[in-house]
Design a protein with these regions (language model features):
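The feature encodes the CheY-like receiver
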Residues: 5, 14, 23, 35, ...
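Short hydrophobic/aromatic patch on the recognition helix
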Residues: 60, 136, 140, 185-186, ...
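C-terminal output helix
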Residues: 55-64, 68, 76
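Receiver (REC) domain active-site loop signature in two-component systems and cognate sites
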Residues: 4, 42
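Terminal helix-turn-helix DNA-binding modules in bacterial transcription factors
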Residues: 142-181, 203-204
Length: 204
């Protein structure tokens, strides 16, 4: 609700959306303020949806379902599994906030920079990202639908793909260079992710 004691809904929404720890959380503003200027202020604060009172529970449920569906599509786009029709949707329909884009970019850069690190796990990443382990876990789960370690593995596999297809490394070289210490494990992970073995993929 926009009109609340101590901090109004606009201020709360802005605080949520400007904090990288919570910026991925969808926000619906519910209010009796229905002027164009009020709505502009609401969306400028980062709100994902704006409903004016009186409103129906059916409409609210519909908005919630739509927002959750958009979040699922965003998650698929982040991890590279979006359907063609999702990729082609207008930017305003499926998009990350600048703060969340920067978070994903930074997380990916840190993984790539430390890809040969023996303990490249969530505690290590939390320290590098200046977040608590629980906050980082929730953030990644909210954005990607994956656990932190699952997302790290996807980044490593994508790196291995680049090394094989663009840099000409063989399977063993790509496995070790992308942070896998066991080539057999790498092959299994690769096939699970891409549907074929790494050697078959590179022969396409």
């Amino acid at each position: 609700d926009i009109m609340m004691p101590e901090m109004d809904g606009i201020g709360l929404c802005r605080r949520v959306k400007e904090d990288v720890r919570t910026s991925h959380i969808p926000v619906i503003l519910l209010t009796a303020k229905d002027s164009i200027r009020d709505k502009e202020e609401g969306y400028d604060s980062g709100a994902d949806s704006y409903l004016t009172k009186p409103f129906s529970a059916t409409l609210l449920n519909s908005r919630v379902r739509n927002l959750l569906d958009m979040r699922r599509k965003l998650a698929r786009m982040i991890v590279g599994k979006a359907k063609d029709e999702e990729r082609g949707m207008p930017a305003g329909e499926v998009r990350l906030s600048k703060l969340d884009e920067e978070f994903i970019r930074r997380f990916t850069d840190v993984v790539t920079e430390h890809i040969s690190q023996d303990k490249l796990d969530i505690p290590f990443m939390a320290d590098k990202m200046n977040m608590s382990v629980s906050t980082l876990y929730r953030k990644l789960k909210g954005l990607t639908g994956l656990s932190g370690n699952e997302f790290i593995r996807k980044i490593k596999l994508k790196r291995s793909l680049y090394l094989m297809t663009e840099q000409g490394l063989n399977v063993t070289e790509a496995a070790y260079s992308s942070g896998f210490n066991d080539v057999g494990h790498f092959r299994r992970c690769f096939k699970e992710e891409y549907g074929v073995s790494p050697s078959k993929y590179t022969k396409r």
